[in-house]
Regions:
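Non-catalytic alpha-helical scaffolds and adjoining flexible linkers that form interface surfaces
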Residues: 1-23, 28-317
């Protein structure tokens, strides 16, 4: 009896070699959730799968099988958008890691899929997709029941923009100037301004607000680490990249203001055309005179001396 084929749209989260010619792929589907498949022959040059199983590109796929690992039979690329570049690519890889670790296999999550589809589009089109990534991380945490409701603090009072709150997993926001409950001390916490929490709740994040993005990045990273029971590699790499970029910007500003001297290994800028250079030769003979003399054959050198010419001159006609 032929195995029934299923059809769905999805995104490839990760892929790894299975054999010399096949791949294991982890696909996030809208109707079937996260599904692991084997793409037989996908590594061959003549395979119909080549160039279609790329991350962040929507695909329509057909697969079959009753076991844990399904068999991919057909793929249609639904892309038409550029792949993420630079920081956005790293952020997207971190989002794929979150989906792969938090969502169980073959558990439909259409709301998370729609949010991921919007994130994949922002990663390709926006110059800085950090706001979209922070909103996606918090949305997934809320869907998984890990993140708290930001409509009020632990005593039911509204979140105030001018206050600072202590945020800990499995707990509601706590005003930083109030003593914590003893049970709360079992968890790591971080401090977040109420204004940033309100922006996160309302989805009003801006790429120009680095302070809010860094603060909310620490918040989502803390909750994701608790939910995944380990530090996410993508989040750790993004933190290191942000620290490096901030250091590079600080050094650039110090060099520009003259407070910091350039290291000895930094080459001096090249002079402008015509500045500090000798006169331009007007002919081939002049160019040869400016160049260092070359070793000539003995007969050629004797002929030039007999004609009264130097080693860099043309012989007399």
């Amino acid at each position: 009896m032929a195995k029934p084929r299923r059809k769905d749209v999805g995104y490839v989260l990760t892929s790894r070699p299975c054999t010399e010619s096949s791949l294991y792929i982890d696909v996030f589907c809208r109707s079937f959730g996260r599904v692991v498949m084997v793409a037989r022959g996908a590594r061959r040059r003549q395979s119909d799968f080549r160039g279609k199983l790329m991350a962040f590109s929507p695909i329509e796929l057909r697969f079959s099988g009753d076991r844990e690992i399904k068999s991919l039979s057909a793929v249609e690329w639904l892309g038409g958008r550029p792949l993420p570049q630079g920081r956005n690519l790293i952020l997207g890889m971190g989002a794929n890691e979150i989906v792969g670790k938090l969502l169980p296999r073959e558990c439909p999550s259409p709301r998370v899929f729609d949010m991921y589809d919007s994130l994949a589009r922002d990663l390709s089109e926006m110059p800085d997709a950090r706001p979209a990534v922070r909103l996606f991380e918090w949305f997934v945490l809320r869907e998984m029941g890990v993140a708290p409701d930001l409509s009020g603090d632990d005593k039911g009072r509204p979140i105030e923009p001018g206050r600072v709150y202590s945020m800990a997993p499995e707990n509601l926001p706590l005003r930083a100037d109030e003593p914590p409950d003893p049970d709360r001390l079992r968890f790591r916490s971080c401090l977040v301004r109420g204004e940033h929490l309100l922006r996160l709740r309302e989805g009003r994040l801006s790429a120009s607000d680095d302070e809010a993005l860094r603060s909310l990045g620490r918040l989502t990273g803390l909750f994701l680490e608790r939910a995944c029971e380990s530090r996410l590699r993508g989040a750790a790499f993004c933190d290191q990249l942000d620290a490096l970029l901030r250091r590079v910007e600080d050094v650039r500003l110090e060099l520009g203001s003259g407070r910091l001297a350039a290291p000895a290994w930094v080459p001096a800028p090249a002079p402008a055309a015509g500045v500090g250079q000798g006169p331009r030769p007007s002919s081939l003979t002049a160019a040869r005179r400016m160049a260092p003399p070359l070793a000539l054959r003995p007969a050629r050198a004797a002929s030039l001396r007999a004609n009264g010419a130097g080693p860099g001159d043309e012989p007399a006609a």
